[in-house]
Amino acid sequence: MRHRRSGQRRLSVRAILSHTLAISLGVLVTVGGLQARPSLAQAAPVEIAQATPANTAAPNSNPDSFVAAAVRQIGPAVVRIDTERTVTRRAAPMFDDPFFREFFGSDFFGNVNPPARQEVQRGQGSGFVVDGNGLIMTNAHVVANADQVRVTLRDGREFTGRVRGADSVTDLALVEVDTKGERLPTARIGNSSNVEVGDWAIAIGNPLGLDNTVTLGIVSSLGRRSSAVGIPDKRLDFIQTDAVINPGNSGGPLVNSRGEVIGINTAIRQAPGAGIGFAIPVNTAKQIETQLLKNGKVSHSYLGVQLLSLTPQMARDNNRDPNSTVRLPEVQGVLIMGVQRNAPAATAGLRRGDVVIATDGQAVTTADEFQRRVEASQVGQSLNLSVIRDGNRQQIAVRTGELQAG
């Protein structure tokens, strides 16, 4: 989180910031979306023709193919989600451009108020049915700010949807459709806690406007923190996969060899020649689903601090640096790099340069570990932090606040 620059003690740029790596590879939210988030690149609106839905069970398909069996299991429950929103734009944006106003002078434009025009922005993503009465799981960014939501099943049935609830922090949303009493095919939900690196991973969705597309890969890694993926405004540990995921896959299921949902396809990290996909673990999605159904929103705890994992070697490097104006304890812990004004951490008296070594008596060694403990707490819960400040150990109680999504 950002903090104001002040005359406070500065930490050694060479010793500390050299350990902080800014991720330069692009992260793409996999949808032809409606609204671009500052840290995420989005695909252009979909304008290509849709492919004819493919048959899922060819009569002479290989009966020993676990992929075909998994697709037969999950396929009917996977949906395409089309969204629209109307935005109003000025016909001549140059009227508001500071460059043109400075070049021509404000008097040149006078009080001219250019006419506004409306545009319809379209996006597309995927989802899957979690309740046969018409409840669908998808990504929050797929349906963000949508005026209209249309859900299409593989069998061609179409429904008008409404967003039942969304949580931008975990990028999950529920869409509800009126089935007029019809039961929809539902996805079989697996257990992401049982997933292991090397397991088969099958991604199903509507990438690039091509309906019912299936790709195969493996689970490449588990517990990839959103900050490591390049999405710092999310609070997630992702399943990483090499199953091909493209724009339009967002919100669709990542399934195991039995056709059970283990994750929700959310993002890709692009690199020359290949891409890496990331899915939200389905166990996380189930927890969010419960809160969205109950409250229509999800509450997240926060402290309002900027953190850096500290090692004894990093502290020694800092302390040897003649340009450093602060000495750090040579311990394993979490260095507070900044404190947000008026945040719970500031209210409790935490300061830049404090080193947290334990929470509620349990040692903490990395920033991610500390962040997970904060996220696991209830809003308003008091956390007892063991902190080293100016070489002295002290206890500071801080009460978590509720993170405001934005």
Swiss-Prot record:
Active site: 141, 171, 250
UniProt EC number: 3.4.21.-
Domain of life: Bacteria
Recorded coiled-coil stretches: none
Entry's Gene Ontology molecular function annotations: serine-type endopeptidase activity
UniProt keyword terms in alphabetical order: Hydrolase, Protease, Serine protease
GO biological process: proteolysis
Domain PDZ: 289-391
Pfam families the record matches: PDZ_2, Trypsin_2
Family: Belongs to the peptidase S1C family.
Protein name as catalogued: Uncharacterized serine protease syc0938_d
Record organism: Synechococcus sp. (strain ATCC 27144 / PCC 6301 / SAUG 1402/1)
